[in-house]
A protein has these predicted regions:
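Alpha-helical transmembrane segments of multi-pass membrane transport and lipid-handling proteins
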Residues: 15, 52-55, 60, 81-110, ...
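Alpha-helical transmembrane segments of polytopic membrane transporters and translocases
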Residues: 26-27, 38-55, 212, 227-229, ...
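Residues that define the loop-to-transmembrane-helix transition and helix capping
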Residues: 4, 35-38, 77, 81, ...
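N-terminal membrane topogenesis motif
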Residues: 1-22, 74, 81, 188-189, ...
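Helix-loop junctions and terminal segments of transmembrane helices
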Residues: 55-71, 250-288, 292-295, 341-348
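Short runs within selected transmembrane alpha-helices of multi-pass transporters and secretion channels
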Residues: 13, 17-21, 25, 43-51, ...
Length: 389
């Protein structure tokens, strides 16, 4: 399938990723309120960290390696089974650590039930094989499946979440969305003639590549999510609710820029692998132009109408999110240029170690500013830390 068709399907996916929150967030924010939204953000973000450890970098590493072998179905299946086996082992181990933490950390024992339900995507994370279809450039399946599952979730949300006490139902619906995605992926994987077998051969070779990508992914996710976790531990769920509404408003629209990058990632890796330098540079130029075209207008838009956006989108109770949103709007430019250099340039050119060093430096600054600013400034401090770091 061509880059243009893949891009269109990925645009469909990202339109659904944008449209779904636009429909659900105003409803959920007004039903649950600031504190419950903050609590939801805390438990889901914490689980995402554990999912990241369970994945061991398979999303980027697996997609890149499958892209290199996409012309050989048998080799693709063999590599899949090796990575899948490693992922099963890591998922079981990390799930065990997660469940232990629910009983061993005081702040978590108070919301143990919510965290246990939110952990469903972690328990079954080995079944998340989006990386396989991404490597094969099967974005049609990824997009249509995601749209279907979001529609199911939307119906469940509107029917079942009616008041503040329904937070646990909201968390359950969110978790089941991941599980349904996993099941559909596995179904089509088997239907297309691929097989699933445990295979630990070449474990050391694959594990080395996974670990390198894992540390890069870990550093990036710490940068993206540590603010939420630190606010949950160092401040209140109210401050977290205010901050999460601001940062979520920005991140909802981030896929507009990253959609082309995800579509081009397998092809860029393939062109680099076969030495097609002309096509490789042509695609990078295209990606850079798209980022420039989208990032600056979005930043200007949110700087100008942040107050009206918060009032309309979240309601009056979220009014304090206006300033954090204006601060976070700078991320449209900063984060997307970082994504371009890190993922589309360094990763596809096999400069993972350089990417890791750059990301770790950013994480250190982000952690430092979070520690300094969150205690005194709360949501505003987390917003500044995200931009500066």
């Amino acid at each position: 399938m061509s880059i243009k068709k893949n891009f269109l399907y990925n645009i469909l996916l990202n339109i659904s990723n944008i449209a779904f929150p636009i429909i659900t967030i105003p409803y959920v924010s007004r039903i649950l309120g600031v504190d419950q939204i903050g609590e939801f953000s805390f438990v889901t973000t914490l689980v995402e960290y554990f999912v990241l450890f369970a994945a061991l970098g398979k999303t980027l590493f697996g997609s890149r390696e499958i892209a290199k072998l996409k012309d050989n179905k048998r080799s693709c299946n063999r590599l899949f089974n090796r990575l899948f086996t490693i992922n099963i082992i890591s998922s079981i181990f990390v799930s065990f650590i997660f469940l232990l933490s629910l009983f061993g950390i005081q702040q978590l024992t108070e919301i143990r039930c919510l965290l246990f339900i939110a952990g469903i995507p972690l328990y079954f994370s080995a079944l998340d094989i989006n990386w396989f279809y991404s490597g094969l450039e099967k974005f049609k399946l990824i997009s249509l499946r995601s749209v279907f599952v979001k529609l199911v979730l939307l119906i469940g949300l509107l029917c079942l979440v009616k008041n503040k006490s329904d937070l646990i139902i909201y968390v359950l619906l969110n978790s089941l969305t991941f599980l349904i995605n996993y099941i559909i992926n596995i179904y089509f994987f088997i239907k297309e003639g691929f097989s699933i077998r445990l295979d630990l051969s070449d474990c050391k070779v694959n594990l080395k590549g996974l670990v390198l990508f894992f540390f890069s992914s870990l550093a990036m996710q710490i940068y993206l999510m540590i603010d939420t976790v630190m606010l949950g531990f160092m401040s209140s769920f109210y401050e977290l609710g205010i901050y999460s509404s601001a940062i979520k408003s920005v991140r909802i629209l981030m896929p507009i820029m990253t959609s082309l990058g995800m579509v081009m990632l397998p092809r860029l890796s393939y062109c680099n692998n076969i030495g097609n330098v002309v096509e490789y540079r042509k695609m990078l130029d295209c990606a850079f132009d798209v980022i420039n075209f989208c990032s600056w207008p979005l930043m200007a838009y949110f700087l100008c109408i942040a107050d009206l956006f918060i009032l309309f989108f979240f309601g009056q109770s979220f009014g304090e999110a206006t300033l954090p949103l204006r601060i976070c709007s700078v991320l449209f430019v900063v984060s997307n240029f970082s994504y371009f250099l890190g993922i589309q340039v360094m990763t596809t050119a096999s400069f993972e170690s350089r990417y890791l060093i750059a990301t770790v430096c950013g994480v250190i600054f982000n952690l430092l500013f979070n520690v300094i600013l969150i205690p005194s400034m709360g949501a505003r401090g987390a917003a500044w830390a995200s931009v500066i770091g």
